[in-house]
Amino acid sequence: MAPKKPEPKKDDAKAAAPKAAPAPAAAPAAAPAAAPEPERPKEAEFDASKIKIEFTPEQIEEFKEAFLLFDRTPKGEMKITYGQCGDVLRALGQNPTQAEVLRVLGKPKQEELNSKMMDFETFLPMLQHISKNKDTGTYEDFVEGLRVFDKEGNGTVMGAELRHVLATLGERLTEDEVEKLMAGQEDSNGCINYEAFVKHIMAS
């Protein structure tokens, strides 16, 4: 019967173990420190007051008529929801990405797309901005977008990383389209001067 006596000691050891357990509780406190938020790029905000309207009075009248076709307000308030903005832009011959539409809208929350309203005077500068960018592109926007990947801050990005960006983000390109754009752009280290690359794209 003597060999059974050590068993309570095992229980004692188990009982003692939890006393050491609270020590690791301090570990979770370190988690908030690793917040990558500051590294996200800051896009220039759309400022309607800086947009110069270059449309003719006749064009503006046509745009207004099209705008009013999307007016779903009960009393005909001559307004559309934020969520309809992209539809109206496309009805007027523009082809903005959803990201571009959200940008000119001030990046509203999902629930605001159906609740917030705008009148034609608010919409017109957005149309002017999208229309102008469709033809000329925005060199600064492209450069700013690629600068995020410039880890060394020396004006270059890795060719492999740029290929990934072109193939997966925004207006996705096929592998062949990416290779045509990248042809002759990489240096001996496999890096690309992104400002020169943007000029190359916009000139082609």
Curated annotation (Swiss-Prot):
The keyword Phosphoprotein applies. The keyword Repeat applies. Residues 1-14, 37-47 have a biased composition (Basic and acidic residues). The modification Phosphothreonine is found at residues 97, 136, 138. One of its GO terms (molecular function) is actin monomer binding. The modification Phosphotyrosine is found at residue 139. The modification Phosphoserine is found at residue 188. GO terms for cellular component: A band; I band; myosin complex. Residues 15-36 have a biased composition (Low complexity). N-terminus is methylated by METTL11A/NTM1. Residues 58-95, 137-172, 172-204 form the EF-hand domain. InterPro entries: CALM/Myosin/TropC-like, EF-hand-dom_pair, EF_hand_dom. Keywords: Methylation, Motor protein, Muscle protein, Myosin, Phosphoprotein, Repeat. GO terms for biological process: cardiac muscle contraction; regulation of striated muscle contraction; regulation of the force of heart contraction; ventricular cardiac muscle tissue morphogenesis. It comes from the Eukaryota. The modification N,N,N-trimethylalanine is found at residue 2. Residues 1-47 are annotated as: Disordered. Myosin is a hexamer of 2 heavy chains and 4 light chains. Regulatory light chain of myosin. Does not bind calcium. This is Myosin light chain 3.
